[in-house]
Protein backbone atom coordinates (compact mmCIF):
# COMPACT_ATOMS: atom_id res chain seq x y z
CA UNK A 1 0.00 0.00 0.00
CA UNK A 2 1.31 3.44 -0.94
CA UNK A 3 0.66 6.31 1.46
CA UNK A 4 1.08 9.97 0.63
CA UNK A 5 0.52 13.21 2.48
CA UNK A 6 -3.13 14.19 2.50
CA UNK A 7 -4.47 16.95 0.28
CA UNK A 8 -7.84 18.54 0.93
CA UNK A 9 -10.56 18.50 -1.76
CA UNK A 10 -10.11 22.25 -2.08
CA UNK A 11 -6.37 21.97 -2.67
CA UNK A 12 -6.89 19.21 -5.22
CA UNK A 13 -9.42 21.31 -7.09
CA UNK A 14 -7.10 24.31 -6.98
CA UNK A 15 -4.27 22.27 -8.44
CA UNK A 16 -6.47 21.28 -11.33
CA UNK A 17 -8.27 24.56 -12.04
CA UNK A 18 -5.01 26.39 -12.71
CA UNK A 19 -5.40 25.20 -16.28
CA UNK A 20 -3.23 26.99 -18.86
CA UNK A 21 -4.90 28.36 -22.00
CA UNK A 22 -5.79 25.73 -24.58
CA UNK A 23 -3.13 27.07 -26.90
CA UNK A 24 -0.52 26.02 -24.35
CA UNK A 25 -1.92 22.49 -24.14
CA UNK A 26 -1.96 21.71 -27.83
CA UNK A 27 0.03 18.48 -27.67
CA UNK A 28 0.22 15.36 -25.54
CA UNK A 29 3.64 16.48 -24.30
CA UNK A 30 2.12 19.68 -22.92
CA UNK A 31 -0.68 17.76 -21.23
CA UNK A 32 1.81 15.37 -19.66
CA UNK A 33 3.82 18.24 -18.24
CA UNK A 34 0.67 19.80 -16.83
CA UNK A 35 -0.53 16.46 -15.45
CA UNK A 36 2.72 15.89 -13.57
CA UNK A 37 2.26 19.27 -11.89
CA UNK A 38 -1.32 18.40 -10.97
CA UNK A 39 -0.32 14.99 -9.60
CA UNK A 40 2.29 16.62 -7.39
CA UNK A 41 0.16 19.50 -6.14
CA UNK A 42 -2.84 17.25 -5.46
CA UNK A 43 -0.57 14.67 -3.79
CA UNK A 44 -2.15 11.79 -5.65
CA UNK A 45 -1.34 8.30 -4.43
CA UNK A 46 0.47 6.04 -6.88
CA UNK A 47 1.21 2.33 -7.04
CA UNK A 48 -1.90 0.87 -8.66
CA UNK A 49 -0.77 1.33 -12.28
CA UNK A 50 2.69 2.83 -11.93
CA UNK A 51 4.84 4.23 -9.17
CA UNK A 52 5.45 7.54 -10.97
CA UNK A 53 3.14 10.29 -12.18
CA UNK A 54 4.55 10.54 -15.71
CA UNK A 55 3.97 6.90 -16.59
CA UNK A 56 0.50 6.76 -15.08
CA UNK A 57 -0.60 9.98 -16.79
CA UNK A 58 0.83 8.81 -20.12
CA UNK A 59 -1.07 5.53 -19.82
CA UNK A 60 -4.27 7.33 -18.87
CA UNK A 61 -4.00 9.81 -21.74
CA UNK A 62 -3.13 7.21 -24.38
CA UNK A 63 -6.11 5.13 -23.32
CA UNK A 64 -8.40 8.17 -23.31
CA UNK A 65 -7.30 9.11 -26.82
CA UNK A 66 -7.59 5.48 -27.93
CA UNK A 67 -3.96 5.55 -29.02
CA UNK A 68 -1.77 2.46 -28.77
CA UNK A 69 0.20 1.94 -25.57
CA UNK A 70 3.08 1.06 -27.89
CA UNK A 71 3.03 4.51 -29.50
CA UNK A 72 6.41 6.04 -30.20
CA UNK A 73 7.68 9.42 -28.95
CA UNK A 74 6.42 11.13 -32.11
CA UNK A 75 2.86 11.12 -30.73
CA UNK A 76 3.92 13.51 -27.98
CA UNK A 77 4.03 16.41 -30.45
CA UNK A 78 0.99 15.37 -32.48
CA UNK A 79 -1.55 18.26 -32.48
CA UNK A 80 -4.67 17.54 -30.45
CA UNK A 81 -8.16 18.40 -31.62
CA UNK A 82 -10.49 20.42 -29.38
CA UNK A 83 -12.52 17.30 -28.58
CA UNK A 84 -9.36 15.42 -27.62
CA UNK A 85 -8.34 18.22 -25.27
CA UNK A 86 -11.77 18.12 -23.65
CA UNK A 87 -11.45 14.37 -23.15
CA UNK A 88 -8.03 14.76 -21.51
CA UNK A 89 -9.36 17.50 -19.25
CA UNK A 90 -12.25 15.31 -18.14
CA UNK A 91 -10.14 12.27 -17.35
CA UNK A 92 -7.52 14.33 -15.51
CA UNK A 93 -10.30 15.96 -13.48
CA UNK A 94 -11.63 12.53 -12.50
CA UNK A 95 -8.17 11.36 -11.51
CA UNK A 96 -7.02 14.48 -9.68
CA UNK A 97 -10.14 15.89 -8.07
CA UNK A 98 -12.28 12.82 -7.36
CA UNK A 99 -9.17 10.64 -6.79
CA UNK A 100 -10.60 7.87 -8.97
CA UNK A 101 -7.91 5.23 -9.64
CA UNK A 102 -6.64 5.25 -13.22
CA UNK A 103 -7.53 1.59 -13.77
CA UNK A 104 -11.15 2.25 -12.82
CA UNK A 105 -11.26 5.09 -15.34
CA UNK A 106 -9.93 2.91 -18.16
CA UNK A 107 -11.67 -0.27 -16.95
CA UNK A 108 -8.51 -2.29 -17.45
CA UNK A 109 -5.23 -3.37 -15.91
CA UNK A 110 -2.25 -5.10 -17.47
CA UNK A 111 -0.40 -7.93 -15.79
CA UNK A 112 2.01 -10.42 -17.31
CA UNK A 113 1.34 -9.04 -20.78
CA UNK A 114 -2.41 -9.71 -20.51
CA UNK A 115 -5.21 -7.18 -20.38
CA UNK A 116 -7.70 -7.72 -17.58
CA UNK A 117 -11.06 -6.04 -17.18
CA UNK A 118 -11.43 -4.31 -13.80
CA UNK A 119 -13.96 -2.10 -12.08
CA UNK A 120 -14.80 -1.03 -8.54
CA UNK A 121 -15.83 -4.57 -7.59
CA UNK A 122 -12.23 -5.80 -7.49
CA UNK A 123 -8.82 -4.74 -6.31
CA UNK A 124 -6.67 -3.48 -9.18
CA UNK A 125 -4.28 -6.30 -10.21
CA UNK A 126 -0.72 -5.86 -8.99
CA UNK A 127 1.38 -8.67 -7.63
CA UNK A 128 4.91 -9.96 -7.45
CA UNK A 129 3.56 -13.29 -8.65
CA UNK A 130 3.71 -11.92 -12.18
CA UNK A 131 7.49 -12.38 -12.03
CA UNK A 132 7.46 -15.38 -9.69
CA UNK A 133 4.95 -17.73 -11.35
CA UNK A 134 7.49 -18.81 -14.02
CA UNK A 135 9.88 -19.78 -11.21
CA UNK A 136 7.45 -21.82 -9.13
CA UNK A 137 8.12 -25.02 -11.06
CA UNK A 138 11.72 -24.85 -9.83
CA UNK A 139 10.41 -25.44 -6.30
CA UNK A 140 8.95 -28.82 -7.25
CA UNK A 141 10.84 -32.10 -7.76
CA UNK A 142 12.61 -32.22 -11.10
CA UNK A 143 10.31 -33.41 -13.85
CA UNK A 144 7.11 -32.69 -11.93
CA UNK A 145 4.27 -31.65 -14.21
CA UNK A 146 1.88 -29.18 -12.63
CA UNK A 147 -1.56 -30.71 -13.04
CA UNK A 148 -3.51 -28.97 -10.29
CA UNK A 149 -3.11 -25.44 -8.95
CA UNK A 150 -5.14 -22.97 -6.93
CA UNK A 151 -5.22 -19.19 -6.56
CA UNK A 152 -6.82 -18.24 -3.24
CA UNK A 153 -8.34 -14.75 -3.05
CA UNK A 154 -8.34 -14.57 -6.83
CA UNK A 155 -10.12 -11.21 -7.16
CA UNK A 156 -10.20 -10.37 -10.87
CA UNK A 157 -8.91 -13.85 -11.67
CA UNK A 158 -5.63 -12.49 -13.00
CA UNK A 159 -3.27 -14.81 -11.14
CA UNK A 160 -5.42 -17.89 -11.77
CA UNK A 161 -5.34 -17.09 -15.47
CA UNK A 162 -1.58 -16.46 -15.42
CA UNK A 163 -1.11 -19.83 -13.70
CA UNK A 164 -3.10 -21.48 -16.48
CA UNK A 165 -1.08 -19.63 -19.12
CA UNK A 166 2.25 -20.73 -17.68
CA UNK A 167 1.19 -24.28 -16.83
CA UNK A 168 -0.99 -25.26 -19.82
CA UNK A 169 -1.55 -28.81 -18.54
CA UNK A 170 -2.88 -27.62 -15.19
CA UNK A 171 -6.44 -27.34 -13.99
CA UNK A 172 -6.63 -24.16 -11.91
CA UNK A 173 -9.14 -23.27 -9.21
CA UNK A 174 -9.70 -19.58 -8.51
CA UNK A 175 -11.31 -18.97 -5.11
CA UNK A 176 -12.77 -15.80 -3.64
CA UNK A 177 -15.32 -14.93 -0.98
CA UNK A 178 -16.72 -11.96 -2.92
CA UNK A 179 -19.43 -12.72 -5.49
CA UNK A 180 -18.80 -9.29 -7.00
CA UNK A 181 -15.13 -10.08 -7.56
CA UNK A 182 -16.00 -13.46 -9.03
CA UNK A 183 -18.33 -11.77 -11.52
CA UNK A 184 -15.37 -9.74 -12.77
CA UNK A 185 -13.14 -12.82 -12.77
CA UNK A 186 -15.72 -14.61 -14.92
CA UNK A 187 -15.48 -11.80 -17.48
CA UNK A 188 -11.71 -12.23 -17.65
CA UNK A 189 -11.87 -16.02 -17.84
CA UNK A 190 -14.26 -15.73 -20.77
CA UNK A 191 -12.44 -12.90 -22.54
CA UNK A 192 -9.06 -14.63 -22.26
CA UNK A 193 -10.55 -18.00 -23.24
CA UNK A 194 -9.40 -19.71 -20.06
CA UNK A 195 -12.68 -21.43 -19.25
CA UNK A 196 -11.43 -24.94 -19.97
CA UNK A 197 -8.56 -24.57 -17.51
CA UNK A 198 -9.78 -22.14 -14.84
CA UNK A 199 -12.75 -22.88 -12.57
CA UNK A 200 -14.04 -20.19 -10.22
CA UNK A 201 -15.44 -20.93 -6.77
CA UNK A 202 -17.07 -18.75 -4.16
CA UNK A 203 -15.25 -19.79 -1.02
CA UNK A 204 -13.80 -18.40 2.20
CA UNK A 205 -10.29 -19.71 1.56
CA UNK A 206 -10.95 -23.46 1.00
CA UNK A 207 -14.19 -23.79 2.99
CA UNK A 208 -16.26 -24.60 -0.11
CA UNK A 209 -13.76 -27.13 -1.47
CA UNK A 210 -13.29 -30.24 0.68
CA UNK A 211 -9.90 -31.95 0.91
CA UNK A 212 -9.14 -34.16 -2.10
CA UNK A 213 -10.73 -37.61 -2.12
CA UNK A 214 -7.80 -39.08 -4.03
CA UNK A 215 -4.14 -38.14 -4.58
CA UNK A 216 -4.69 -37.00 -8.17
CA UNK A 217 -6.98 -34.23 -6.91
CA UNK A 218 -4.34 -32.68 -4.62
CA UNK A 219 -2.67 -29.42 -5.60
CA UNK A 220 0.89 -29.19 -6.83
CA UNK A 221 0.80 -25.42 -6.30
CA UNK A 222 -1.28 -23.09 -4.16
CA UNK A 223 -0.66 -19.37 -4.46
CA UNK A 224 -2.33 -16.44 -2.77
CA UNK A 225 -2.10 -12.67 -2.67
CA UNK A 226 -4.55 -12.35 0.23
CA UNK A 227 -5.78 -9.37 2.22
CA UNK A 228 -2.82 -8.65 4.51
CA UNK A 229 -3.14 -5.04 5.63
CA UNK A 230 -3.86 -4.68 9.36
CA UNK A 231 -7.33 -3.23 9.85
CA UNK A 232 -6.00 -0.03 11.41
CA UNK A 233 -3.85 0.60 8.32
CA UNK A 234 -6.84 0.11 6.03
CA UNK A 235 -8.69 2.82 7.95
CA UNK A 236 -5.96 5.29 6.97
CA UNK A 237 -5.60 4.48 3.28
CA UNK A 238 -5.36 7.13 0.60
CA UNK A 239 -8.57 7.65 -1.40
CA UNK A 240 -7.28 5.68 -4.39
CA UNK A 241 -6.77 2.57 -2.28
CA UNK A 242 -9.91 3.17 -0.24
CA UNK A 243 -11.81 3.06 -3.55
CA UNK A 244 -10.91 -0.63 -3.81
CA UNK A 245 -13.02 -3.19 -1.92
CA UNK A 246 -12.08 -3.23 1.74
CA UNK A 247 -12.47 -7.00 1.71
CA UNK A 248 -9.46 -7.19 -0.61
CA UNK A 249 -7.22 -5.26 1.80
CA UNK A 250 -8.29 -6.01 5.37
CA UNK A 251 -6.32 -8.88 6.87
CA UNK A 252 -7.70 -8.44 10.38
CA UNK A 253 -6.08 -6.87 13.45
CA UNK A 254 -2.55 -8.01 12.58
CA UNK A 255 -2.97 -8.70 8.85
CA UNK A 256 -2.51 -12.46 9.22
CA UNK A 257 -6.07 -13.73 9.73
CA UNK A 258 -6.48 -15.08 6.19
CA UNK A 259 -2.90 -16.36 6.06
CA UNK A 260 -3.39 -18.51 9.17
CA UNK A 261 -6.51 -20.10 7.74
CA UNK A 262 -4.87 -20.62 4.35
CA UNK A 263 -1.88 -22.45 5.81
CA UNK A 264 -4.06 -24.65 8.01
CA UNK A 265 -6.28 -25.66 5.11
CA UNK A 266 -3.47 -25.98 2.56
CA UNK A 267 -1.82 -28.84 4.41
CA UNK A 268 -4.80 -31.09 3.68
CA UNK A 269 -4.96 -30.09 0.04
CA UNK A 270 -1.35 -30.12 -1.16
CA UNK A 271 0.24 -33.11 -2.84
CA UNK A 272 3.20 -34.53 -0.84
CA UNK A 273 5.61 -32.67 -3.14
CA UNK A 274 3.48 -29.50 -3.28
CA UNK A 275 4.15 -25.95 -2.13
CA UNK A 276 2.09 -22.97 -1.05
CA UNK A 277 3.33 -19.46 -1.90
CA UNK A 278 1.87 -16.36 -0.24
CA UNK A 279 2.43 -12.65 -0.91
CA UNK A 280 2.41 -10.74 2.34
CA UNK A 281 3.59 -7.14 1.81
CA UNK A 282 5.52 -5.75 4.76
CA UNK A 283 4.73 -8.53 7.24
CA UNK A 284 7.90 -10.57 6.75
CA UNK A 285 9.03 -10.27 10.38
CA UNK A 286 5.58 -11.20 11.66
CA UNK A 287 5.45 -14.24 9.37
CA UNK A 288 8.92 -15.43 10.38
CA UNK A 289 8.02 -15.02 14.04
CA UNK A 290 4.62 -16.74 14.01
CA UNK A 291 5.37 -19.46 11.47
CA UNK A 292 8.98 -20.25 12.39
CA UNK A 293 8.13 -23.95 12.64
CA UNK A 294 7.20 -23.93 8.95
CA UNK A 295 10.63 -22.60 7.89
CA UNK A 296 9.18 -20.15 5.34
CA UNK A 297 11.53 -19.48 2.43
CA UNK A 298 11.42 -16.02 0.86
CA UNK A 299 11.56 -15.65 -2.90
CA UNK A 300 13.75 -12.92 -4.33
CA UNK A 301 12.07 -10.24 -6.42
CA UNK A 302 13.65 -7.81 -8.85
CA UNK A 303 13.11 -4.81 -6.59
CA UNK A 304 14.45 -6.59 -3.51
CA UNK A 305 11.19 -6.47 -1.56
CA UNK A 306 11.18 -10.29 -1.23
CA UNK A 307 7.65 -10.32 0.20
CA UNK A 308 6.49 -13.74 -1.04
CA UNK A 309 7.14 -16.78 1.12
CA UNK A 310 6.94 -20.47 0.31
CA UNK A 311 6.14 -23.40 2.59
CA UNK A 312 6.46 -27.03 1.56
CA UNK A 313 3.78 -29.66 2.11
CA UNK A 314 5.92 -31.77 4.43
CA UNK A 315 6.43 -28.80 6.76
CA UNK A 316 2.70 -28.11 6.85
CA UNK A 317 1.86 -31.73 7.64
CA UNK A 318 4.28 -31.76 10.57
CA UNK A 319 3.01 -28.41 11.86
CA UNK A 320 1.36 -28.51 15.30
CA UNK A 321 -1.51 -26.00 15.37
Model-derived segments and spans:
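SAM-dependent Rossmann-like transferase core, predominantly class I methyltransferases
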Residues: 75-82, 86-168, 177-184, 209, ...
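A general structural signal for well-ordered alpha-helical segments in protein cores
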Residues: 32, 57, 88-89, 156, ...
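Residue-level signal for inorganic ion chemistry
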Residues: 60, 99, 129, 159, ...
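S-adenosylmethionine
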Residues: 134, 169-171, 175-321
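N-terminal auxiliary segments of SAM/dcSAM-dependent transferases
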Residues: 5-111
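Accessory (non-catalytic) regions of SAM-dependent nucleic-acid methyltransferases
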Residues: 1-19, 23-26, 30, 297-299, ...
